[in-house]
Amino acid sequence: MTANKHGFEPKTEFTIGGIAFTVIQTGEDWVKCIASECVEERAFDAKNRNDFAASDIRAYLNGEFLRRLIAAGAPEEMFEYFNIDLTADDGLKTYGGDRVRVGLITCEEYRLFREHIPALPNDWWWTATADSPINSFVRYVSTDGTLYVSYAIDGGGGVRPLCNLKSEILKSYLSGGYEKQDAPEDQREKAVDMMKHIAAAWDIDAEEVFGRADE
């Protein structure tokens, strides 16, 4: 794991937009963090789709939830786009990948960074990983930390948002010295992000239209 030049380390906890987050991975100028607790309970998808890219939970996290953080004072420029590998738990790569500003942890990431993730002995919570494209199950983390499955339509699943944050802005924000920059927003990336979600929702091969998320 790369050391962060702004001093953030795994297991560091801080509050942004009224939500407590814990660092699980560091890069030189960014940190990946997960909500320290479940922020709410909701279905992965009301239509029982287990493809994160097409899901209601994905739309919620990158829409209403992100707007709520920003409205509570979190700098919008702090949230980086990052890739999510949507390989299913059975190894099938039907769902490809996705690119988001707020996501959910995958099963592979959970295994890799488990020691940095606060345990929740009273809640179970969704991952972004489908059990298989041939069913409607989504993998989730149980109260004892093991991985199980539930239907995507299950409304009792906990939500622990995952973010990649620019650590320079994060440090300034936490110290109270952040001032919004006047640099123009990347409207093209936002538009592509929206179109990819629409394509996934309508079962269009987004990779053929926009290219792979990891390119």
Regions found by a protein language model. Give the residues of each.
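Short, charge-rich amphipathic interface segments used for partner binding and complex assembly
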Residues: D203-D214
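Collagenous Gly-X-Y triple-helix signature in extracellular proteins
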Residues: M1-E189, M194, A200
